[in-house]
């Protein structure tokens, strides 16, 4: 049985209740009153509880900082650029979310290092322009340089860059041009099982070899290194005793598809808030005073 959970900040053991905070207050985060006792929950249920990081005293409680213009109008539709290296199943789900209203945005560009990959073919069949990055060593005329890539993204008015199975390191020029606007999805619970060389089935093999009881996707902001940016959301998937890497990968991918669409939906609705200590939180759509 699988368990779903959204985490902000690092993956921690569950606590006995979810917490919430107000954007305009620096009072301590207070627990919800209507929460069942943690001790009566199964391990899967405990892991599925939504939590935010614990904060100690009021004097040291970080404030929530909104990075929006403060206006009350509905957010405009955002323009998204998606980066892929393979079949692009997460890209397809995001594109479907844009079409069915789950995401208040549109995919305006597909960037890939493999011009004939499945994700690129899907983009072309749906009228989405495809760019090649980085330049191929054998065919340098086909690709873009880092500065050219930044220029094209700006020309298209891209608001957010979404990495969806893109296996190349993002250049510093792009990170600096789009601060806090580049997301990546990784098929394990970071900070464990991440870094250069850990991708695809290799990640799931490493999880099983470690004896970890839970795995699952992580969505994080991108910096200049592999898999080290601020964690925005995670979803826990229980590891079964006789799992194979392929079976675990299938269940984690199922969670990836749901989680990425949810998070992209939140970021397009301007529901990502930043604590003063640099931790990103997701604002609850139904209850704006609650953060995940």
From Swiss-Prot:
Positions with a binding annotation for N(1)-(5-phospho-beta-D-ribosyl)glycinamide: 88-90, 256
GO terms for biological process, alphabetical: 'de novo' IMP biosynthetic process
Keyword Transmembrane helix part of the UniProt annotation: no
Pathway the protein contributes to: Purine metabolism; IMP biosynthesis via de novo pathway; N(2)-formyl-N(1)-(5-phospho-D-ribosyl)glycinamide from N(1)-(5-phospho-D-ribosyl)glycinamide (10-formyl THF route): step 1/1
Transit peptide: 1-65
Record-linked InterPro entries: Formyl_transf_N, Formyl_transf_N_sf, GART, GART_AS
Sorted UniProt keywords: Chloroplast, Plastid, Purine biosynthesis, Transferase, Transit peptide
Catalysis: reaction(s): N(1)-(5-phospho-beta-D-ribosyl)glycinamide + (6R)-10-formyltetrahydrofolate = N(2)-formyl-N(1)-(5-phospho-beta-D-ribosyl)glycinamide + (6S)-5,6,7,8-tetrahydrofolate + H(+)
Active site residues according to the UniProt entry: 186 (proton donor)
Keyword hit for Cytoplasm: no
CC terms in the record's Gene Ontology section: chloroplast
EC number: 2.1.2.2
Subcellular location as annotated: Plastid, Chloroplast
Binding site residues for (6R)-10-formyltetrahydrofolate: 167-170, 184, 227
PROSITE patterns: GART (PS00373)
Annotated site, Raises pKa of active site His, chain positions: 227
GO MF annotation list: phosphoribosylglycinamide formyltransferase activity
Family, as annotated: Belongs to the GART family.
Name under which the protein is recorded: Phosphoribosylglycinamide formyltransferase, chloroplastic
């Amino acid at each position: 049985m699988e368990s779903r959970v959204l985490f902000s900040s690092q993956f921690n053991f569950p606590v006995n209740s979810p917490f919430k905070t107000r954007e305009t207050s620096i009072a301590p985060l207070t627990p919800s009153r209507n929460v069942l006792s943690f001790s009566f929950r199964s391990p899967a249920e405990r892991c599925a509880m939504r939590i935010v990081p614990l904060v100690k005293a009021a004097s040291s409680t970080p404030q929530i900082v909104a990075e929006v213009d403060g206006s009350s109008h509905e957010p405009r539709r955002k323009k998204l650029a998606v980066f892929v290296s393979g079949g692009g199943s997460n890209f397809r789900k995001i594109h479907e979310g844009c079409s069915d209203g789950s995401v208040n945005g549109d995919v305006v560009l597909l960037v890939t290092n493999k011009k004939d990959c499945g994700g690129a073919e899907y983009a072309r069949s749906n009228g989405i322009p495809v760019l090649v990055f980085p330049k191929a060593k054998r065919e340098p005329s086909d690709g873009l340089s880092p500065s050219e890539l930044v220029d094209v993204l700006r020309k298209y008015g891209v608001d957010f860059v979404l990495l969806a199975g893109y296996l190349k390191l993002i250049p510093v020029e792009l990170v600096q041009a789009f601060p806090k606007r580049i997301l990546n999805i990784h098929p394990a619970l970071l900070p464990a099982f991440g870094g250069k060389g850990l991708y695809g089935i290799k990640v799931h093999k490493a999880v099983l070899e470690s004896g970890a009881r839970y795995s699952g996707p992580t969505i994080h902001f991108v910096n200049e290194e592999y898999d080290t940016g601020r964690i925005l959301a995670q979803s826990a998937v229980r590891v079964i005793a006789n799992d194979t890497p392929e079976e675990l990968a299938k269940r984690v991918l199922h969670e990836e598809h749901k989680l990425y669409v949810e998070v992209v939906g939140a970021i397009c609705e301007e529901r990502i808030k930043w604590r003063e200590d640099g931790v990103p939180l997701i604002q609850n759509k139904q209850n704006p005073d609650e953060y995940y």
